[in-house]
Amino acid sequence: MFSLNSSTIAFSIGNFNIYWYGVLFALSLLIGWYISNNIVKQLNNFGYSNLTLNEFDSFLFIGLIVVIISSRLGHVLFYDFQFYKENPIEIFMIRHGGLAFHGGLIGLMIYVYLYCKKKSISWLLLLDVLSIAASAGLITGRLANFFNQELVGKIWASEYGVVFPLVDTFPRYPTQLYEALTEGLLAFFIQIMYLNINKWKSFGTGRYAVIFGIVYSTSRFIIEFFKDVEEIFITNNLLLTVGQILCILMFILSLILYSIGNRKISESI
């Protein structure tokens, strides 16, 4: 059995505290930026894109703001609306945790579509680039959830359980680590393997976005059964969480994206 520290502070500078959540969240953004920049650079070298790195960095900077705002709004609206309705000031307390992936995804996809339409750039190509960066960033992003002791698993009477002292004294499933390994590492590994096979020619087909969408939605749907989150009734015999419902929609969207990519490939032949 493993127990986390009761403090979420990584280190302090004078009276200013630096939290693990902020450190790891910033690291996830840095990893995503580094990987996406290198992909765009390679695409330019092979003639698959004319998007300059300066343009891409500007796109990412605004995209980051969009993702943070939409992720926070997603958490507020999807998961704990009543609490934030009664405590509106807490909406701005991001350091307490509470960024919903699906909210960020919705905001980012809208931003990508509008940006690409304005710049006459392939939106599928940008989605592919961002999907690989997102899967890599999610590895440390879920570690941020782990050290912030949020999104914890159900009580698990096992020597492999983890105690989150800010929650209670019971060992629980470390579901954040499960998600880091599947939504992050597994999705990234499959995408890189597909990239090695196709030698960059598959960018702009939406394939990497589809791989990420399917791996993420499937793995999170399963892991949600082990999370200590409120379930909602769908039928008399089936209980699903809000996250699982959003994952079902994400899976369907991935299949639609696959169909769109296939149609574009057929038109180019």
Question: At which residue positions do the language-model features occur?
Answer:
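Hydrophobic, membrane-interfacing alpha helices
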Residues: 1-269
